[in-house]
């Protein structure tokens, strides 16, 4: 459950290290984001000399959440951290690598490029 003011780790190699959610796209005013949802975020911490700088406004897709994600078959999955991957307007990742596992729910949102870059899909 990601809402505005939530801090997230960045799971790619764009140079950003930490994001803060400022808007959840889709839904109404009180909507919270979960795995596979797109957010607007600001970069709070970044590596020097990389394409993404501190205080940049970026689009990102949630790939891991600490809140349980219920699946249709009755199981649920939970991760140790909240993490996102920075994407462009066409929903393709801006980085060339994705770190850590990602949830299978990304397949429903047509984020197949992120799934193919991820080392593990849970």
From Swiss-Prot:
CDD domains: Ribosomal_uL14 (cd00337). InterPro entries: Ribosomal_uL14 (IPR000218), Ribosomal_uL14_bac-type (IPR005745), Ribosomal_uL14_CS (IPR019972), Ribosomal_uL14_sf (IPR036853). Its main location: plastid. GO terms for biological process: translation. The keyword Transmembrane does not apply. It is found in: Plastid, Chloroplast. Keywords: Chloroplast, Plastid, Ribonucleoprotein, Ribosomal protein, RNA-binding, rRNA-binding. It holds the Pfam family Ribosomal_L14. One of its GO terms (cellular component) is chloroplast. The keyword Thylakoid does not apply. One of its GO terms (molecular function) is structural constituent of ribosome. Belongs to the universal ribosomal protein uL14 family. Binds to 23S rRNA. Part of the 50S ribosomal subunit. PANTHER family: 50S/60S RIBOSOMAL PROTEIN L14/L23, LARGE RIBOSOMAL SUBUNIT PROTEIN UL14M. This is Large ribosomal subunit protein uL14c. The lineage of its organism: Eukaryota, Viridiplantae, Chlorophyta, core chlorophytes, Trebouxiophyceae. The gene is rpl14.
